[in-house]
Amino acid sequence: MNHYTILGLSEPPHVPELTSADLKTAYKQALLKNHPDKLQEREAYTGSVQITAITTAYACLSNSKLKKEYDLSLKNGANGVKSGPGSDVFDLTELEEREDADGMFSWYKPCRCGEAGGYVLTEEHLENNEKYYEGVDVQFHEIVVQCGTCSLWITVQYGVEEE
């Protein structure tokens, strides 16, 4: 699946040109269609598109520079897989871990834009992300994180310890 199919759109070229309003509408419809709270049966979620994939697709296609690079990769037969800046996937263990005075953990990764602490992930982010995986049996979870100073995104995968 590529970013266009994830959002329920046809692949380029688009005639007429795909507008930002079209993209935003497709994004909202994809979120509603695939959100666990909106599905009729919890089992249906396992076959749906992950919310993080929808968010990543929208982030790429709504940025004109990233969209051009992505469209070029599709044209060149790359099927959009890991194309363009900001589409890297990392394991949580690859990020620098820090603990604050209250015992809360945060993870950091430098961004290609040059910002040393560009990507920041907190325990709260991970806890909030868990609601998307309730009742779903997967080996790892993932969350999309945007750089704090630019438009690049990464996907962070992590395992969850059973309590």
From Swiss-Prot:
Taxonomic superkingdom: Eukaryota
Cellular localization per UniProt: Cytoplasm; Nucleus
Keyword Iron: yes
A GO biological-process term: protein histidyl modification to diphthamide
Record-annotated J domain positions: 2-74
GO CC annotations on file: cytoplasm; nucleus
Positions that bind Zn(2+): C111, C113, C147, C150
GO molecular function, one term: metal ion binding
Pfam families membership: DnaJ, Zn_ribbon_CSL
Associated pathway: Protein modification; peptidyl-diphthamide biosynthesis
Keywords per UniProt: Cytoplasm, Iron, Metal-binding, Nucleus, Zinc
InterPro entries (alphabetical): DnaJ_domain (IPR001623), DPH3/4-like (IPR044248), DPH_MB_dom (IPR007872), DPH_MB_sf (IPR036671), J_dom_sf (IPR036869)
Record domain DPH-type MB: where: 89-159
TM ranges: none
Domain statement: The DPH-type metal-binding (MB) domain can bind either zinc or iron ions.
Described function: Required for the first step of diphthamide biosynthesis, the transfer of 3-amino-3-carboxypropyl from S-adenosyl-L-methionine to a histidine residue. Diphthamide is a post-translational modification of histidine which occurs in elongation factor 2.
Family from the record: Belongs to the DPH4 family.
PANTHER family tied to this protein: DIPHTHAMIDE BIOSYNTHESIS PROTEIN 4, DPH3 HOMOLOG-RELATED
Name of the protein described by the UniProt record: Diphthamide biosynthesis protein 4
Organism of provenance: Yarrowia lipolytica (strain CLIB 122 / E 150) (Yeast)
Gene that specifies this protein: DPH4
